Amino acid sequence: MVTITDCYHKANWIGHPVKVRLIIYLFAGSAPLSVFTLSTISTVISIRQLYHNGCSGFITESGRT
């Protein structure tokens, strides 16, 4: 099972323009993407965009601000 923690670690070191394609490649290359996985990837991308934009919002365990 893919967790938000697994995805975020990978997203953290990937450069901003490349990270979306690389995260999707990491999962699409090894297994079919489930709805849960797509949702997880979307949440990771949202977190990274908030971080990149300097948002000081509080991020909960669910990944929502």
Swiss-Prot record:
Signal peptide: none annotated. The keyword Mitochondrion does not apply. This is ORF2p protein. It comes from the Viruses. Residues 13-18 are annotated as: Important for viral replication in intestinal cells. Coiled coil: none annotated. Facilitates virus release from intestinal cells in vitro, possibly through the host autophagic pathway. Its main location: host cell. It is found in: Host cytoplasmic vesicle membrane. Keywords: Host cytoplasmic vesicle, Host membrane, Membrane, Transmembrane. It is a single-pass membrane protein. The chain crosses the membrane at residues 22-44. GO terms for cellular component: host cell cytoplasmic vesicle membrane; membrane. It comes from Poliovirus type 1 (strain Mahoney).
